[in-house]
Amino acid sequence: MVRSAMLEISINGQPRQFDAPLSVAILLEREGLSGKRLAVEKNGEIVPKSRHAATPVEAGDRLEIVVAVGGG
């Protein structure tokens, strides 16, 4: 039986674990955030929405995810 590796990453300063392989798009889907207006920063660099599917998440990565909230 083959087990996928566990990735240890940080999301908004909180340690988390996910099965590998993982992209930003898959991470957002697993977190229930796909389709929302948000910004993703990976290790200090903004990840454009057009690159979410192609951007891998790797062990030790630090992600900041900010969800836009409407209001006034």
Where are these regions (language model features)?
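Ubiquitin-like/PB1-type beta-grasp interaction modules and other compact soluble beta-rich domains
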Residues: 1-71
